[in-house]
Amino acid sequence: MDVTRLLLATLLVFLCFFTVYSHLPPEEKLRDDRSLRSNSSVNLLDFPSVSIVALNKKSKQISRKEAEKKRSSKKEASMKKVAQPRTPLSAPCVATRDSCKPPAPACCDPCASCQCRFFRSACSCRVLSLNC
């Protein structure tokens, strides 16, 4: 009985050994210095060629005009965001970052909302969106 267990154990060890080493990639054997040099050097023909094109004055002016248009549109968008009126604050409210457990009133900031963590044991008013 002990001999069969010993044989089964060695068979199991050899099977594990062969399965592990059969999945590993075979190692490359370098026979001389020439193969070492060819494997280590980078072949420049493998990379695509790069062409350098000089910009003429028209394309530079167009790109400057486009950049100015983008800047002006960003400024207009920021001006529109600032011009939006805020709703008046109600008297019974919770300030931002203060505790707002469910029986408490709503948050003072219209962009803030009450966020609860740890199974509604720790709640606080937080601003979720910066664009509000």
From Swiss-Prot:
The protein's name in its UniProt record: Agouti-signaling protein
Compositional bias per record (Basic and acidic residues), positions renumbered to this chain: 63-79
Main localization (coarse): secreted
Entry's localization field: Secreted
Organism, scientific name: Trachypithecus auratus (Javan langur)
Glycosylation sites: N39
Entry comment, domain topic: The presence of a 'disulfide through disulfide knot' structurally defines this protein as a knottin.
A molecular function GO annotation: melanocortin receptor binding
Signal peptide (residue range): 1-22
Record keywords: Disulfide bond, Glycoprotein, Knottin, Secreted, Signal
SMART domains hit by this protein: Agouti (SM00792)
